[in-house]
Amino acid sequence: MSRKLFTSESVTEGHPDKVADQISDAILDSILAKDPMARVACETFVTTGLVLVGGEISCQCYVDIPKVVRETILEIGYTRAKYGFDGDTCAVLTAIDEQSPDIAMGVDKALEAKTGETTEAEIEAIGAGDQGMMFGYATDETPELMPLPISLAHTMARRLSEVRKTGIVDYLRPDGKTQVTVEYDGDKPSRIDTVVISTQHHPEVDLETIRKDMIEKVALHVLPAELVDDKTRFLINPTGRFVIGGPHGDAGLTGRKIIVDTYGGSARHGGGAFSGKDPTKVDRSAAYAARYVAKNVVAAGLAKRCEVQLAYAIGVAHPVSVRVQTFGTGAVSDEVIIDLINRHFDLRPAGIIKSLELRRPIYKQTAAYGHFGRPDLDLPWECTDKADALRAEAGLK
């Protein structure tokens, strides 16, 4: 079999782009908790001592945005001014407008209802909030049906945050990144080739101490022992020093970690980010639906790997296209799988929102460590409740 390497990365909740994502989703959750029908497109920019929140929000409630921002920053761990970013003292600026009425009229009443193609009741008067394509993916490499490299990178990033917050490693600061290179024998993971951990730290801690702790208390604590061998490389803070970090070291923006948020590069991406967007935005809801579909296809045994593409036009409820690729692993043809998908999944925005119960404040928890394959969270798009029906209708035992 051919041997090949594949690499994926993750970042901790203290990474500046993830700080921005979490602020945007914390604001979204705070609004949805009071007004589930709100329209939210919330973008965040963070830099040294400053948070700027902008976007378009239409809702029937009041949310204290600066308070939400500060609470989120403090929860992440930026609690002292010497970190260059502190939730108590940073400036918070807001520039919020209402959703464009031109967009709203397309979302509020879908094209099919206007032209009589279907009843307004059937589509719940919701058209897609924008055009675009979204991808979902699943593979049988891991129990959560995610690619192994991104799964391991997220697991290490969560562990890195855990040892900081619990004091197991008391010199760490919030910013950090992980990266895992997995060697494949054909399509099966065979070993871990390279592990990279970069973590912000107290200025007086030496690199050898950091290296020892990161290998023993982070990497080897969570990586599968059977995949680590004497040739596995561990690269810890390769530059030698990582004291200045977080928004003080790099500006952060909502939506700049879309590959970390999804499949670590193992599948294609439509380009749309998730955080700060209410579920009428198909960038988010349809990407969740595509994952839900792909995961159920793999869980049903219809394929070992499955990538689903959905595409939408603004103001139109039904997807303009549904595409499936199983990379030669299908137990049935891709055409049969598409037919099963069309019969078992309602992929109109209203149908997605209803079936996955997306008008709830459930988004902040997804804004770090990935939106998919999260055994630590109860996410509706990770459910495999359609697998039995798909398997039965496909005629598989």
Curated annotation (Swiss-Prot):
GO terms for biological process: one-carbon metabolic process; S-adenosylmethionine biosynthetic process. Its EC number is 2.5.1.6. It is an enzyme of class 2 (transferase). The keyword Magnesium applies. Keywords: ATP-binding, Cytoplasm, Magnesium, Metal-binding, Nucleotide-binding, One-carbon metabolism, Potassium, Transferase. It catalyses: L-methionine + ATP + H2O = S-adenosyl-L-methionine + phosphate + diphosphate. It holds the Pfam family S-AdoMet_synt_C. This is S-adenosylmethionine synthase. It comes from Desulforamulus reducens (strain ATCC BAA-1160 / DSM 100696 / MI-1). The lineage of its organism: Bacteria, Bacillati, Bacillota, Clostridia, Eubacteriales.
